[in-house]
Every structure is written in structure tokens, then in C-alpha cells.
């Protein structure tokens, strides 16, 4: 819907975001003067019809137009799809419930074939690259605090007119629920006792079981861990399904970063984690015997944040 442009015009009065400092990375955005001309050339606001997802095309603009388009989405999850990208988008994400920005984490996952634009985190004129325009590379999940800034999507110069689409899914969640993805994006490390005890309260799934196999997928930089579950404490989205042999067990798989170097291990574990973008992602996974000790110790001291059946 065009016509509601006051917010965009306020933006147009600001300086264009500055490119990241020197160092390895993609070519910087065009010079400041050219970018200022882009802004002055026009800006428009777009409101999604369902407030969760937006789909647009650069072909709707005049050939010489280099607009900066404002997109406003007010939802906890959705997607952005931009066909034939030209110029730039500023994507404003807000939850559909009142929640302070400092308590919210935003995670984005590029579409598998996304191409035609770079995606930056932008705040007060500074740019930090999140997703580089490299066609054919699988998109990695990127997370940041909502108070760190918004999304600036800039089309890259193209030598042909073949169809290109830049797109991504997004999720907004409380800071605590987004913790697992931040842990996964950092060097892998075992969870502390406090993190494990909190994970059993806040995770989307909490199960007890064994690792049957691990499949490494280098092209996606992930490892898929196949589990046989003996005790289902909690799950969402039906990650684990009853085993076909009707043995009282459940089967399912979770993913973690390839760099974590997960290998099949003997013994029983407690697996926790969250479901993001339809995928179960591993959080804390202590050996069950170690978990029993830390849980009982916390229970004796009265500091366990929630209860779980240990039988």
C-alpha cells in the first residue's frame, strides 16, 4: 500500500548507512554520494497484507528508479521475498504483542536459492553484513537482538536479466528462547549446570535416549543426529515419532553445527533444544547420569527452576 510515506521520508533525511570498515568481505556498497542520490530519488512504504510476510518485485518500479523501500511487518514469524531486486529495502520487524526490544531476538534464514542482494544489520548508519549474495550457497541462520538494529537489503549489480529472488524466513522470540541459536553460532562448548537446568524448563523438546547415527552434511555445514528416544518428557511439532516396531520408543533427528564435531557416543543422554524454521536444533545434551547428579544436587538446595520426572 503506497501513500503512507511519512516514516520513509523521515528516513530519507538521514545519511545512508555506512559500509563496514576495512578488512576481508564483499565489495562495499556504492559511494556515499551515489547512495544519497538513491535516497533522494524516492522512498516508499509497503505494508504487508497479512502483517507477517511480504512479497514484491523490482519490475514494478520505473527502469531508472533506485528507490529505498520501507517494509513493515508485525508478527512473530514470516518471510520476505523480493523478485528482481533493484535499489534497497529497509525491513522493519516488530512483534504482534507488546515486548521491549531489548528482550527480543531476531533470527533469519535465507531461502536456499536466494540471490541478487546482500542483507545487512543496520543501526544509526552503520552496516554489518549478515548474508552475502553468493548464488548456490546454503543459507545459514543468523541471529541478533532487535535493539541492535533493523534489516537493510541492498540489490547487487547484475550483468543479465535472469530471474533472481532474494528471500528469507524470520522469527522473533524472547531473548532466552533465542539463546540456543546464539550458542550454536559461537564455538561449540558444553552447557554449564545452570544452562542445563534452565534448558529443561524452556526447551521445545526434552527427551532421554541414545544416538543411533550421525550424518555430516558439509554443503550445509550441519550434522544430523539420529536419535532413539526412550523417554519423551516434552516436545512440540512432533519432532519424534513412535518407532514402527511398536517398542515403546520414538525416533527422530536433530541438527547441530558441523564444526561441533558430533560423533556417535555410547550411553544415554538427555537431549534438549528448540524448533526453528521447522528444524529441531540441539541445545544442551548432557549424559543422563551427569544430569541426574546435577538435578538432585539442585533439588536438595532448592534451586532447580522447574521439575522433571527422573524415573
Swiss-Prot record:
Keywords: Disulfide bond, Glycoprotein, Hormone, Secreted, Signal. GO terms for biological process: brown fat cell differentiation; energy homeostasis; fat cell differentiation; negative regulation of inflammatory response; positive regulation of brown fat cell differentiation; response to cold; response to muscle activity. Its main location: secreted. Disulfide bonds join 52-75, 107-143, 188-260, 191-284, 201-306. Abundantly expressed in adipose tissue. It is found in: Secreted. It comes from the Eukaryota. Residues 1-45 form the signal peptide. GO terms for cellular component: extracellular space. The keyword Electron transport does not apply. Glycans are attached at residue 103. GO terms for molecular function: hormone activity. Hormone induced following exercise or cold exposure that promotes energy expenditure. Induced either in the skeletal muscle after exercise or in adipose tissue following cold exposure and is present in the circulation. Able to stimulate energy expenditure associated with the browning of the white fat depots and improves glucose tolerance. Does not promote an increase in a thermogenic gene program via direct action on adipocytes, but acts by stimulating several immune cell subtypes to enter the adipose tissue and activate their prothermogenic actions. Belongs to the meteorin family. This is Meteorin-like protein. It comes from Rattus norvegicus (Rat). The gene is Metrnl.
Amino acid at each position: 500500500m503506497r501513500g503512507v510515506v511519512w516514516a520513509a521520508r523521515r528516513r530519507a533525511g538521514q545519511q545512508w548507512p555506512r559500509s563496514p570498515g576495512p578488512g576481508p568481505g564483499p565489495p562495499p556498497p556504492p559511494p556515499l554520494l551515489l547512495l544519497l542520490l538513491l535516497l533522494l530519488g524516492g522512498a516508499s512504504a509497503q505494508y504487508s497484507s497479512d502483517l507477517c510476510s511480504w512479497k514484491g518485485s523490482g519490475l514494478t518500479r520505473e527502469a531508472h528508479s533506485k528507490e529505498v523501500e520501507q517494509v513493515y511487518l508485525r508478527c512473530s514469524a514470516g518471510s520476505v521475498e523480493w523478485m528482481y531486486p533493484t535499489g534497497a529495502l529497509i525491513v522493519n520487524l516488530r512483534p504482534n504483542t507488546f515486548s521491549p526490544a531489548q528482550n527480543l531476538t531476531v533470527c533469519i534464514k535465507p531461502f536456499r536459492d536466494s540471490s541478487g542482494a546482500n542483507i545487512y544489520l543496520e543501526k544509526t548508519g552503520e552496516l554489518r553484513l549478515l548474508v552475502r549474495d553468493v548464488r548456490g550457497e546454503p543459507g545459514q541462520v543468523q541471529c541478533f537482538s532487535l535493539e541492535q538494529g533493523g534489516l537493510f537489503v541492498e540489490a547487487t549489480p547484475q550483468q543479465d536479466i535472469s530471474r533472481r529472488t532474494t528471500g528469507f524466513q524470520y522469527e522473533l522470540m524472547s531473548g532466552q528462547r533465542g539463546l540456543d541459536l546464539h550458542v550454536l553460532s559461537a564455538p561449540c562448548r558444553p552447557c554449564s549446570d545452570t544452562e542445563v537446568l534452565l534448558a529443561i524448563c524452556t526447551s521445545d523438546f526434552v527427551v532421554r535416549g541414545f544416538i543411533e547415527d550421525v550424518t555430516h552434511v558439509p554443503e550445509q555445514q550441519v550434522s544430523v543426529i539420529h536419535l532413539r528416544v526412550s523417554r519423551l518428557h516434552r516436545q512440540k511439532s512432533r519432532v519424534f515419532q513412535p518407532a514402527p516396531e511398536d517398542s515403546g520408543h520414538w525416533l527422530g533427528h536433530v541438527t547441530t553445527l558441523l564444526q561441533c564435531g558430533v560423533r556417535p557416543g555410547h550411553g544415554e543422554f538427555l537431549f534438549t533444544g528448540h524448533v526453528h524454521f521447522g528444524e529441531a536444533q540441539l541445545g544442551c545434551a548432557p549424559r543422563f547420569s551427569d544430569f541426574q547428579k546435577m538435578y538432585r544436587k539442585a533439588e536438595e538446595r532448592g534451586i532447580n527452576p522447574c521439575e522433571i520426572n527422573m524415573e
